[in-house]
Amino acid sequence: MYPDFPSKFIKASVLIAFWAGINMGTHVAFSIGFGFDLGPGYHAYIQTHGSLQLIGWVGLFIMGVSIHFLSRLAHFKFVDENKITLIYRLMVSGLIFRFFFHSILPYFHDSIWYGILSLGVVISATLIAMGIYDYIIFLISIVGSMQPSLFKTNRDIRVFLIMNIIGWVVYAVGSLILTIYMMASHEVSLIHNWHIFLVDFFILFSVFPICFGVGLRALPLFLRLPPIKWNVKKFSLIYFIVIFSLINFKLINHYIYIDWLQELIYSLSILKDMIIIWFLEFNS
């Protein structure tokens, strides 16, 4: 039995985007607009706002859509509704914890309450990581149950699904490590460079690939469009190689500054953009 469309994920993503994301964004804009002292909490608010939008809005939306469409694409009928509900509760609980505890943490930096509030941020990252873990188990089941008919070059989206899994894993583990380090070092925000790296990694490895995968397989199927005739597998491998190279060169550049490496990163970024534009133009 295929699962019903998990609309609760979509509803939660919209509510978090408007209730929590816009709430924090308004707070930051108000402080800047009226010239209030931003203080050490500025980066914390920016990071929390970004995380709520990325995981709360985009992430929950991706989860809801992929659970519905991917299970049907792979003819995977053994979806445990209780497991889907558990993923939802863990993700939403973690996001609410992040919003509440990280919003007020900067105001209690030198207070006895810092330990409790920072622990709340760590718990939020733990809950989100647990939700992502259960979601990844679902994705692995989907990849493992794909029928040979889906392995044709114009239908094979396994590389995109594997990239999606890698993106979720790295973001979940990385965010948990950064929050633990934040609490241990008595800070109110995550290490900026590594936080930005995780965001970029998640977008390049999870957001874009799942959009490619669902767009290539689900839209023609459900909208009764002509099937894809070009080599999807080759396209996915090209995208993976470009993104893998871009991420690794950025890591090297973080530790070792080389002039030509900057130009290479810039060139790979342009190539990545060209690949995305080609996909949009070719499938419009």
Residue ranges of predicted features:
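Hydrophobic alpha-helical transmembrane segments of multi-pass integral membrane proteins
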Residues: 1-284
